Amino acid sequence: MTRRVITAVLGVTFSAACIGACSEDRTGFARNDSDFDVDASALPDAPDCRLQCSLDGRSVIEACTGKVVQKCPDDLACGAATCQEPCAAAAADRSSNGCDFYFQMPRMDKIYPHSCNAAFIINTSTQPAEVTLERKGKAIDISKSVFRTTPGSTALSPHEGAIPPGGSVILFVSDSPPGTEAWDYIKCPDGVTPATLDDTVANRTGVGSSFRLTTNVPVSLTSMYPFGGALSYVASATLVLPVATWGTEHMIVNGWEGSWTGKPSVQIVASEDDTEVTIWPTRDILGNSAVAGAPAREPVKYRMDRGQHLQIVQTEELTGSIVVSNKPTTSFGGNSCARISVSAAACDILSQQIPPFEQWGSEYVGVGYRPRVGNEHEPMPYRFVAARDGTRLEYEPAIPPGAPTTMNAGEVASFRHGTGDAFVVRTQDAEHPIYVSAHMTGGNGDGFGITDPSYGGMGDPEFVNIIATGQYSNSYSFYADPTYAENSVTIVRRKSNGAFKDVWLECAGNLTNWKPVGTRGEYEFTRVDLSRNFQPGDTFGDGDAATVCRTGLQRMRSEGPFTATLWGWDVNASYAYPGGTAQRKLIDTPLAPVN
């Protein structure tokens, strides 16, 4: 075996070396030609009397009876069926709620101006949440950067002190210096003092520094860039995943293929010093003076310190490339300004934090946003990424036109399907997981209506993780951006113990108008509008008892598993992110290099 060595210095602590070629040993990709797993819903339910946490996280209960076994003291919370310190409980429960996060702007190309970057923070605990922000190990003053909002309004009020239980705030983390003027630049709202005025994200491929946000109790965190992005035309949002759920094995997922306005991107983040990251690239990594390049299918090694991120932005996608680290890391996939499709008339920044490989699933439900012009068959792109050779896919109710039925390790497949034409896709077993994303096309189509229809300029390219059914949870809190004309949430619920459980949305009560998905009767979906053309969304109930959904903080819960994805769009602008997710380990067999 030939050994190649490439070294480079990244700042003072970041280096890379290309090491020996991949082995032909594919042990981790053993084929399994057995039939697909039998549907669990066809088997009789067995009593499950394990201990678990109550929905409010305040008690340990019996799963089969709901009987309270232990009520947690006020200063503790339930996690992994044990009363413990709140942050430890959140880490044990492995969800998107947590106490330690890293994130950075998805401004991967400096051709686009440094606009306002904001974070939506929701206190999901029963105690006040204290928030701290740092970068490069230095604390950042946020005393003038935290604001409250009113449901359905863009008005902001300064917030001081801790976030109350169940409360939410917007933290304005970054903006350009005062006086900046540029086309499509969106500054932070008047009266806001952003926490920072500099950008520590590299221009295209390079090394940058991420923000670190920590709290004393669990919160839900979303990064929005730019805030008020409906006027920037390039907005994106991502649910930020806590450090406690990071992993040491990943597969790179870019947001979309390259075009003349934008290139596929990945940001790999370290939370500890002396983190060693090895990438097995599916295509050549084009290096520069800051980052060592590497030929396709030959591993390249990088060293990172806490809070650093390695950013790779290039025309050739690296989707399907394996990333392995000696300490927990995470990755954000995206595109510096994607056109979907590549002939679309406008582009948009894409960014999603990608779950580590061990959290990928073998079953997903595909269903999209409320159609932009009323056509439930509006073609919406889906993308699949496979992790194992010999991955076989089955669908219900039918195979969508163009959808793959077999995939190999590192392979990417895309197809379009009606936004309301819901389907279930599953592989032969849990050890053949896939990643699935949903996308929105440009609001003006391709400008001519030849390959992509126009939607009157509404919406723009977007990219969002679809949550695996094995990662559904039973409560979420999230924030709908009031600066967008349209905000809608898509909810999918799974049958639990032979029955569908009510799903409660704070502005609506128990949701109705569920539609079946597939043929086995295991899933249903519904949608709720939170705004329409800047006006309030759906109304529930009659007379004095009627309630109206609006933008701002949203809370949902159920006694059964479900998922919720928020979509927002405006003229040539869009954003989307999951309202939350469990982050359970679903896979036992490690990744192996893709040859």
State where each predicted segment sits.
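Ser/Thr-rich, Pro/Gly/Ala-heavy low-complexity intrinsically disordered linkers and tails
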Residues: T2-V5, S15-R50
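Short, solvent-exposed coil/turn linker segments
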Residues: V5, K71-P73, E506, N510
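Feature targets compositionally biased, intrinsically disordered low-complexity regions
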Residues: L10, I19, T27, D39, ...
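A subset of signal/propeptide-processing and intrinsically disordered low-complexity segments
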Residues: I19-G20, T27-S34, A40, G57, ...
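A generic signature of intrinsically disordered, low-complexity regions enriched in glycine/proline
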Residues: G28-A30, F36-L43, G66, Q104, ...
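Conserved functional hotspot residues at active sites or interaction interfaces
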Residues: L51, Q84-G320, V324-A422, R426-N595
